[in-house]
């Protein structure tokens, strides 16, 4: 798989750009702040419908405009597929697949399969659980695009249930007992969609675990052994496959956990149980990586998580596109060499670098130089001829 064309309109610092890309390695070179990462961000957005840098879409739209457009043409096994994504201010985002409108932007997920390495990856080890949940969900969505709808529905139900919890004090004051019947309805919906999301995550962690261990050993052969696990906000012992029985069991356990925390939830007005409270546990030896890993160990583990994702996607069928956003500058010589070796088999590798010296020696790559120019609305990124 490779991206043949990337077009941007009013995306971040890019007013207008059309890039013809090729299989193999391409390096986008330019000083920091010139818009290199914005190209990688656009491709990652096309992969997951989300940015790796911000949680909202608004910052992706160029200042002074009301919409951004990302256009890609992806070649997979000789077949071309065109995707256009429109990110709008105050409106629902839109998508087109092969120039035809689709019902939901989620319908284009899976066209581009990519793995992203970025400086923000250190947050997978040292950051909050939300960073690790997003890593799992993004990978699950790339592998099984239907998970995007599962997560979206869970988040919708979670918002509704949270709003209902916050309304309970007022309902009690008015003597309205119907709110508790409504809460039970939302409990059932939360359990249904939450169980499906948890089952997908557990299955993914089980497949990732041996790959993370192998990748970490490659990157840090003298360090402790790496391991990962899934920590849920409820009892999940037992299920390991994504069968209907497992999802039903998880839903029952989630309902039981909601009932057990009901008083605390009503008191605090928040949902205390569910996949939005879960975490991916990372360990080095018998210690948690967060708080105990050195800087080098943390980087090795973060890269190992991405390499494990890359390996799973390869096993699924087809080489995913590798997106390396200024990551070589963050790694020492040994880890840089290990990542470069892993990337050798990829059909397409797209890299950003502030200076060419950040690229591993001996890499044969096309170079695209990025600059900035001023216009009436400020500065904008451009590709040098």
From Swiss-Prot:
This is DNA replication and repair protein RecF. The gene is recF. One of its GO terms (molecular function) is ATP binding. GO terms for biological process: DNA replication; DNA synthesis involved in DNA repair; double-strand break repair; SOS response. It comes from the Bacteria. Keywords: ATP-binding, Cytoplasm, DNA damage, DNA repair, DNA replication, DNA-binding, Nucleotide-binding, SOS response. SUPFAM superfamilies: P-loop containing nucleoside triphosphate hydrolases (SSF52540). Signal peptide: none annotated. Gene3D superfamilies: P-loop containing nucleotide triphosphate hydrolases (3.40.50.300), RecF/RecN/SMC, N-terminal domain (1.20.1050.90).
């Amino acid at each position: 798989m490779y991206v043949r064309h990337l077009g941007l309109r009013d995306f971040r610092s890019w007013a207008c750009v059309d890039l013809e890309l090729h299989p193999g390695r391409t390096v986008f070179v330019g000083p920091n702040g010139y818009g290199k990462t914005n190209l990688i961000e656009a491709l990652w957005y096309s992969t997951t419908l989300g940015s790796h840098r911000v949680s909202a879409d608004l910052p992706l739209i160029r200042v002074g405009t009301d919409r951004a457009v990302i256009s890609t043409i992806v070649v997979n096994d000789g077949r071309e597929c065109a995707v256009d994504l429109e990110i709008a201010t105050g409106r629902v985002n839109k998508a087109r697949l092969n120039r035809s409108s689709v019902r939901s932007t989620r319908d284009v997920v899976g066209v581009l399969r990519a793995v992203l390495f970025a400086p923000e990856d250190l947050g997978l080890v040292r950051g909050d659980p939300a960073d690790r949940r997003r890593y799992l969900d993004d990978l699950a969505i790339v592998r099984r695009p239907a998970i995007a709808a599962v997560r979206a529905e869970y988040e919708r139900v979670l918002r509704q249930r949270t709003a209902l919890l916050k309304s309970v004090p007022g309902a009690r004051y008015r003597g309205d007992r119907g709110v508790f019947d409504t809460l039970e309805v939302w409990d059932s919906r939360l359990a249904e969609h939450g169980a499906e999301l948890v089952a997908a995550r557990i299955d993914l962690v089980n497949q990732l675990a041996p790959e993370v261990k192998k990748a970490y050993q490659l990157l840090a052969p003298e360090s402790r052994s790496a391991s990962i696990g899934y920590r849920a906000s409820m009892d999940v012992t037992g299920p390991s496959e994504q069968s209907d029985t497992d999802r039903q069991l998880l839903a029952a356990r989630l309902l039981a956990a909601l009932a057990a925390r009901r008083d605390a939830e009503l008191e605090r007005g928040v949902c205390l149980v569910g996949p939005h409270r879960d975490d991916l546990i990372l360990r080095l030896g018998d210690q948690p990586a967060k708080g105990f890993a050195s800087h080098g160990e943390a980087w090795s583990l973060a890269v190992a998580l991405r390499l494990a994702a890359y390996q799973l996607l390869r096993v699924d069928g087809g080489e995913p596109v590798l997106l390396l956003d200024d990551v070589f500058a963050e790694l020492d010589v040994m880890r840089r060499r290990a990542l470069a070796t892993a990337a050798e088999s990829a059909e397409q590798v797209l890299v950003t670098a502030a200076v060419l010296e950040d690229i591993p020696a001996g890499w044969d790559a096309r170079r695209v130089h990025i600059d900035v120019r001023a216009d009436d609305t400020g500065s904008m990124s451009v590709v040098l001829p």
